[in-house]
């Protein structure tokens, strides 16, 4: 018998699978009774190097180019401090989430669960009065994951169209930016139809090369003509910090992509840990983001745009090469981040007759709809800064803080929260931070988008 494909959901009718909540004794010993990593079967697995490359590709993109704008909202000192603290918080929450998802696998005796499945299992393990909300909570988590990745892919399309428009305006007739969005969608169509993560690794490698080549070339403009550093703010008023957090959150993490990479690894045990793939990747990402944020703000000050590529000259050959490299790198990032959406949407898809025969066709249709829906939103509200802030605030609050904390609260309900209830206190703090930041950050970004959409309607 062939091993079960990684892309298929476990058969919950299998009598060998545990479907009922475990007792306290069973929960405590579950680690020693079942190791889900040994049971996983991935059709085309990622090596640790593949996973590292894919993680960099997931996170490094338009966010790093927006970090100078983030530092404009915080100042040098406060931006550095908040970047480090935010990365520690986000990385810790990812570790907590993956550890809890692994515990869900042990309790249900299955090789792997998706994030929505983990939420459902956690609700079933919690107090009796919330057990009935498990499926609804799992469905809501799916919606949150899909919407977060939808916003991210929309940001990518807006970024690509803006940069290629600047190049096009110099050589050909000035066309509306929305035409560039449409062309980008058409060119992405064949790449977005790739259905195996392993086969996206070459694209990710090319994308990383283009991005870092562009980053290296842009140093010429960043270091040429640096003003006196005393002309820049060290600490800005606290009212502006919320924008920094939203932009930095967008540039520092991508929960859905991080989970998909871990799920497709040949050796997922190497993902976490002090010197695991995840920690090494986020350290590299943090240093890169801080460097770009500090140098970009130092060079351009209050005139910095939502992407640093929009600050460099439009009519110079070097600047045009930079924009082509970086925009092409971001363009090639879209298939990987869109892959996350498809994985989430089909993780619980029943591979039964007759629908199983049409699963591939349905997946292609969903991919097509997703691509052109992101294009439609990019055409309607091409505000790069506001979209970046909205995606950062939405994903940080829901995926990085609320979901991991709620899963942990309910999973530990029967087992206990440790001495002085420290786990419960930690989870409550994560929930409060997520709620406050989510409400404030999303409100600010949505107000900007509404104003921009009104301007779009008036210009038609």
From Swiss-Prot:
Pfam families according to UniProt: Aa_trans (PF01490)
InterPro entries assigned: AA_transpt_TM
Membrane topology classification: Multi-pass membrane protein
One Gene Ontology molecular-function label: L-amino acid transmembrane transporter activity
Location within or outside the cell: Cell membrane
GO cellular component, as recorded: extracellular space; plasma membrane; vacuolar membrane
Note: The name 'polyphemus' derives from the Cyclops in Greek mythology that failed to guard against Odysseus as mutants are unable to defend against microbial infection.
Family per similarity comment: Belongs to the amino acid/polyamine transporter 2 family.
Function as written in the Swiss-Prot or TrEMBL entry: Probable glutamate transporter which transports extracellular glutamate into the cells. Regulates the production of intracellular reactive oxygen species (ROS) probably by controlling the synthesis of antioxidant glutathione. By regulating ROS production in blood cells, required for maintaining bacteria phagocytosis following infection with S.aureus and possibly E.coli.
Protein name: Glutamate transporter polyphemus
